[in-house]
Regions:
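Short, contiguous acidic/charged loop-to-helix segments that flank catalytic cores in large enzymes
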Residues: 154-163, 198-202
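Acidic low-complexity segments
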Residues: 51-158, 178
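Short clusters of hydrophobic/aromatic residues that line enzyme substrate/ligand-binding pockets
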Residues: 4, 140, 223
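Generic secondary-structure boundary/loop-capping signal
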Residues: 9, 135-137, 152-154, 199, ...
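Conserved small/polar residues in nucleotide/adenosyl-binding loops
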Residues: 244-246
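Intrinsically disordered, low-complexity N-terminal segments that are enriched in acidic
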Residues: 1-93
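Hydrophobic/aromatic-rich core segments of domains that either
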Residues: 1, 166-239
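A mature extracytoplasmic/lumenal domain signature
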Residues: 38, 84-86, 144, 186-188, ...
């Protein structure tokens, strides 16, 4: 059951726009370009806090999830320009409620784990949760066993083996059970630096999933639970993942 994940962002933004505000935005005077090869998708990757400034592509701006979506499939090479900005976000109570929603069939075992790890601050709980994945019992594997029964319970307590989406999804679910607004984010990780052209090249094999949590004093904070896995527990190809501290 993945009903807790965002699905209809435009409808949600229309209903929650009074709860989501951008404050004190300012230009960082940083621009960059992305060259997209044809990949038959509509979404447009970008760095965080970026404004599209190209006029050579028709897009829909998804304010709710802070992403750009092309109106047409990207079936030819495109060079797209962005400008970065710095901003502070305010998340209203309606959106905080939305980002803490969970499926109705969550197992009592997961709820009990959250209660047993009750913390005085969100950061303390998130550190406990992150460190739980670094205890040596979890493994990274691109070809794990199939889930059965309650997927997240089975992964967290029994299987303990999977790829980035398993870890990000479980992390977000447990954070939400602790009443911490959170969401899954997908994108690219790593890439290859071209020293001659001074650019990074990303391939589909570089796709990755991680978590973002909302902290009132910091806004959306990126946390990659997959990076907690010890190198010795990697059972399939995985680039070294840098730790993200709160």
């Amino acid at each position: 059951d993945k009903s807790w994940r965002p699905s209809s962002s435009y409808y949600l933004f229309d209903n929650y726009k009074s709860s989501f505000k951008v404050k004190d935005g300012r230009d960082l005077n940083q621009t960059y370009q992305i060259i997209l090869e044809p990949f038959k998708k509509k979404w447009i990757p970008s760095l965080k806090n970026s404004k599209l400034i190209s006029n050579n592509i028709e897009i829909s701006e998804d304010y709710f999830n802070q992403i750009y979506v092309s109106r047409d499939l990207i079936d030819r090479k495109k060079q797209i320009s962005f400008k970065r900005y710095k901003t502070n976000y305010y998340l209203g109570e309606d959106l905080k409620d939305y980002y803490t929603k969970t499926p109705s069939n969550i197992s009592n075992r997961l709820k009990t784990w959250v209660l047993n790890n009750n913390s005085s601050t969100p950061t303390e709980f998130l550190n406990k949760l992150y460190n739980n994945f670094s205890d040596g019992s979890y493994y990274y594997n691109l070809s794990p066993q199939n889930f059965s029964g309650n997927n997240y319970e089975n992964f967290f307590f029994n299987l303990k083996e999977g790829y980035c989406e398993y870890y990000a999804g479980t992390f977000v679910l447990l954070a939400r059970l602790a009443n911490i607004p959170s969401r899954i984010v997908t994108g690219y990780y790593g890439g290859e630096l071209n020293d001659v052209g001074d650019f990074y090249k990303f391939k589909q094999k570089d796709t990755h999933a991680w978590a973002e949590v909302w902290l009132d004093d910091k806004g959306w904070v990126r946390i990659d639970p997959t990076s907690a896995i010890p190198d010795s527990n990697v059972r399939n190809t995985l680039n070294n993942l840098s730790l993200i501290h709160i």
